[in-house]
């Protein structure tokens, strides 16, 4: 609708550019991320979980006990309706509202390089790029696995900012950091991993 949404520590606001009016949506605090769900609803990420806002009535619905107390840094809703949630310590959570299901990726159950996800950018060619505490990670949607680009693979040292990034018209990815913007070209090649079966010829526990 061409509105501008603004969050913060104390309240949520919507600026209507056609009427120059501002509407307050009291009820949540410490808003960290705002994403449109559909024409009537907005996803609101906060320092204590996820909410679904009815923009007409102003009512909030808490989204799932699995996210209770989770600090959310970034939100991205894909074209298929899946909501990708970047958290500050709990990895990446994929939420499917139709059946209220959650899929959680973190360092112990995937190749994700860090559990602190700062920014999630829109999907391009089946890949979703994210900035993390330890570098940039690329999630392959179909295969459901991560490839990482860290200082060990040549990434310049950077401390990324939460919810700071954009997808350019040329499909390159831009992430904001404390040292400026870092642009990643669309055709960047991430290090690939090779896995093989290990065979032990001896095993000793002391």
Residue positions per predicted region:
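Carboxylate-rich, polar loop motifs that coordinate divalent cations or form catalytic acidic clusters
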Residues: 1-206
């Amino acid at each position: 609708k061409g509105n501008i949404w603004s969050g913060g520590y104390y309240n949520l606001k919507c600026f209507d550019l056609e009427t120059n009016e501002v509407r307050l949506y009291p009820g949540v605090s410490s808003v960290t991320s705002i994403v449109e769900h559909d024409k009537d609803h907005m996803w609101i990420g906060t320092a204590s979980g996820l909410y679904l806002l009815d923009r007409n009535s102003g009512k909030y619905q808490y989204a799932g006990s699995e996210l209770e107390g989770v600090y959310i840094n970034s939100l991205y809703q894909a074209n298929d309706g899946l909501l990708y949630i970047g958290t500050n310590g709990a990895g990446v959570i994929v939420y499917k509202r139709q059946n209220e299901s959650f899929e959680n990726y973190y360092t112990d159950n995937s190749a994700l390089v860090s559990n602190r996800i700062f920014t999630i950018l829109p999907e391009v060619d089946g890949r979703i790029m994210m900035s993390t505490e330890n570098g940039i990670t690329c999630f392959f949607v179909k295969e459901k696995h991560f490839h990482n680009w860290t200082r060990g693979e040549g990434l310049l040292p950077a401390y990324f900012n939460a919810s700071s990034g954009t997808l350019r018209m040329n499909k390159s990815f831009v992430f904001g950091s404390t040292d400026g913007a870092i642009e990643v070209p669309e055709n960047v090649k991430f290090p690939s991993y090779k896995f093989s079966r290990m065979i032990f010829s001896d095993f000793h526990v002391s």
